[in-house]
Structure formats: C-alpha cells, structure tokens
Amino acid sequence: MPSFDKPTDQQEATRDAQGADSRAATEVALFEAFGGVRGMVETTVPGLVFVAIYTVKRDIHIAAIAALGLSLLLGIARLVRKDTLKHAFSGVFGVAFGAVFAMMSGDAKNFYLPGMLYTLGLAVGYIVSALAGYPLMGLILGPVFKENLSWRTRNPGRKVAYTKASWAWGLILLAKSAVLFPLYWWGDVTQLGWVKVALGIPPMLLSVYLTWIFLSKAPPPIDVFAEMEAAERAEREREATAR
C-alpha cells in the first residue's frame, strides 16, 4: 500500500530536478546582472594598465589616457556584441572620472579615488538598506528575476535571502575599503594601484557566490509579469464568454 505521508521517488526526483534548474537559472541571472566574468575583468584591466604605465613612465597623463582609451575600446566592443548599455559604459564612466580627476589634481592616486568612494558608498548603501528592510540586492535583482518587489510582501523567504546577500556585499566592500583608504592616505600610487587590482575580482566573486548560495536556498521567485499576463488572459476569456 503506498504511503501518502512521504513523497514518492518520482516526486523527489522531480523536486531535485526543479531545484537544480532553479539554481542554474539563479547562477545565470546573477552573472548576467553583474556583467559576468568578462565584466569583472573589464573593470580591473584599465586600473592595471594605469598602474603599469605609471610605474614605468611616471607620467599621469600618459597612464590616464591609456587606461581611458582601453576602457572605451572595451565599451565599444560590448556595443558591437550588442550587450546592454549599462555593461558597456558603466566602466567607461568610472575610468573617465578617475582619469580627469588625476590629471586635474596632478596626483596619480586620485585616479583610484572615485572608484574607492563609489565602493564605500555602495557598502554603506547595502548595509543601511538591509537594516531598513529594503535590501538593495532585492531592488537590484527583483527585476532580473521578474519578481519586482513581490519578494518583500509575498515571499518572505526571498526577503531573508536578499537581506543576507546585502549584508554580505556590504561587509565585503567595507573590508575592501578598509584596506584601500589607508593606502590612499599613507601609501604610494604603485602600492595602491597593485593592491586595488588584486582586490578587484576576488571580492566580487565571493559576493556573487554568497548571493547565489542564499538565493539557491530561498523559495523560487514569484513571476509578477506571468501573473499579470494570466490575469489579462482570464479577463479576455471572461469577456469572450459574456458575449
């Protein structure tokens, strides 16, 4: 006699398959949202070019123009590949601010200051938003998973996951800032540059990995767009039946 208290092997296999599909979809969506490995590399390479050229030439203008030129080429390449404008130009603007700031101030360390301030501000934003009950990671990824803000009011498990992810991002970026700002104040530009390059990809990968862990254990997202389409379809069917 079959037991109705325990799931059958087929049901367990179906759940495992659905869970694997959900984790895979989460992984793909996360890497898409943050530009993928290529995006991480592209945000690091201009800084590497700047510090390498400055170490050899000791010329702020040559180093800054080279870094900015490379960033523009990478952005154009993304446009040719029909990537999103966000991924194509987000790095370009950051490098441009740093290049202009360094050349105007005459201090090569200022090439890195806009990015450092952005990182610190982002860290504070993640932590404050988590404390306020509106985790920034949920606001960023909600549209990616087609759930918008449904995670906050209708899916408490997702809210918990987004809160944990926001804390993870905030603390990791805060730790990164705690390393970089003392080097900016008391170190030289080569020390700051090489350490900043070294701290480019690993913290990002760790943050994305922890986000994936939290979301893969959370309930699946509620597709609000599918719900709206279903409601519109049902409304059209009712109208057709009433005629």
Predicted feature descriptions by range:
Residues M1-G35, E232-R233:
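Short, Lys/Arg-rich, polar N-terminal cytosolic tail immediately upstream
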Residues V80-T84, M104-Y112, V189-T190:
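Membrane-interface helix caps and helix-loop-helix hairpins in membrane proteins
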Residues F145-R243:
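C-terminal membrane-adjacent module
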Residues G47-T55, L72-I76, A99-M103, V124-I127, ...:
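Alpha-helical transmembrane segments of multipass membrane proteins
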Residues I53-G69, A88:
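Structural signature of hydrophobic alpha-helical transmembrane segments
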Residues A17-E32, V45-V56, L72-K82, A161:
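Short juxtamembrane and helix-loop transition motifs at transmembrane-helix boundaries
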Residues K109-V160:
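Membrane-proximal helix-loop-helix units in multi-pass membrane proteins
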Residues L85-A96, Y112-T119:
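Cytoplasmic-side transmembrane-helix entry/capping segments in multi-pass membrane proteins
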